[in-house]
Amino acid sequence: VWCDPDAALPEPWASGEAATATALEQWRLQSGFPPGPGELNGETNPLELGLVAQVSTEKGCYLGQETMAKLIGQAGVKQQLRCWSCPSPLAAAAKLTLDGERAGVITSALERDGTWLGLALVRRQCLASPTLEGPNGEQLQIRQPEAFQDPDA
């Protein structure tokens, strides 16, 4: 909604509070909304981020169309976006493991009320695990984002 900055807001917005940048980032991370610099950066594709409904395999020619059609048809994504939480501090680019093997990487992180939360790209073979380990043995709880559209479904 665009409003004139000098005009009064209409109800119900007038009685609400403006969201802070931190609150918006918390919402983005908790809901698994991928348009952040750690997720949409040229290193990932829309299917890994759960955006399969936003990809057309029928529409005209576009860069990557053939690759997207192949990935959709063969369930070929190597990793998928997941929400995570952990009581210990972790940062973007931290490597994740499962039973000592490479499992993924944190793409976004935020501390809120003593808990760390964020998004991570998790390798396909590790998606079923509810927990992964951070670089120093931290235990991360992993879950599929609410709005994630599984390219394999």
What are these regions (language model features)?
Residues 16, 21, 39-43, 47, ...:
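Short, functionally important structural connectors and interaction interfaces within domains
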Residues 1-34, 132-133:
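Acidic, low-complexity central loop/insert segments
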Residues 27-49:
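Short, conserved active-site entrance elements at the starts or edges of catalytic domains
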Residues 27, 49-55, 59, 63-65, ...:
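Glycine-rich, small/acidic residue-mixed loop/short-helix segments
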Residues 10-15, 39-41, 72, 108:
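A short secondary-structure junction signal
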